[in-house]
Amino acid sequence: MPPAGFEPAHPPPEGGALSPELRGQLIDQVISPMCASRTHMAELVIMSQSLNLAYFGTGCFWGAERRFWKMAGTTNTAVGYMGGLRENPTYEQVCSGATGHAEVVMVEFDSSRITYLDLLREFWTMHDPTTLNRQGGDIGTQYRSAIFYTSDEQKEIALQSLSAYQEVLTKNGFSKITTEILPAPQFWFAEEYHQRYLEKNPNGYDCHSTTGIAYPETAHEKI
């Protein structure tokens, strides 16, 4: 189930935030069949065609969620688990490595204010995508780098952005990007205490070992 009291992490200044009246309604149509399950989507009502979902795995989801919710144009964020075999896994089960899930941030964004490529640019530079199944001292398949796309358009943009970032990483002596780019499976909300963890604990753990290499500005012109 969605975390209790789930609210927009970064509501836009003019509209777009979830209203209390709409909370709890079940969505009849979602952006793509590959989006989160309708049960979970009941708490993330898509209020216009300009709102979309994106899913990213960058290691520990605490710090990643904070980076995304601070971006102007994101209207909701939540953390959870994707890409595993067990239904509705617990944090302990995911951390055991036995379920195959990755820690993931779900980002709802207003495409009239921020693009999917903007989110990808933040994704690539907030972690080290060349380290397989680890970020800094966090080691395990749950910390793998991953993009779960919700449409063919997202898939194409993600693949092109990977190529663009790989080119600049290679020039700077880094190895091959290990990020998996896959269709979005079901998203399982993480436990309540994980949601916006660093808002509740500003000095909490935020382990992201970045490459320090900026995403190439010219890549936006090509994609």
What is each of the regions a protein language model found here?
Residues 19, 23-27, 45, 52:
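Compositionally biased amphipathic helical and low-complexity segments enriched in hydrophobic
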Residues 5-7, 18:
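Short glycine-rich, low-complexity segments
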Residues 11-12, 31, 56, 203:
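Secretory pathway export signals and precursors
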Residues 5, 26-42:
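N-terminal, intrinsically disordered charge-dense segments
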Residues 42-223:
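Flexible coil/turn and secondary-structure edge motifs
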Residues 10, 20-21, 29, 40:
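Intrinsically disordered, low-complexity segments enriched in serine/threonine/proline/glycine
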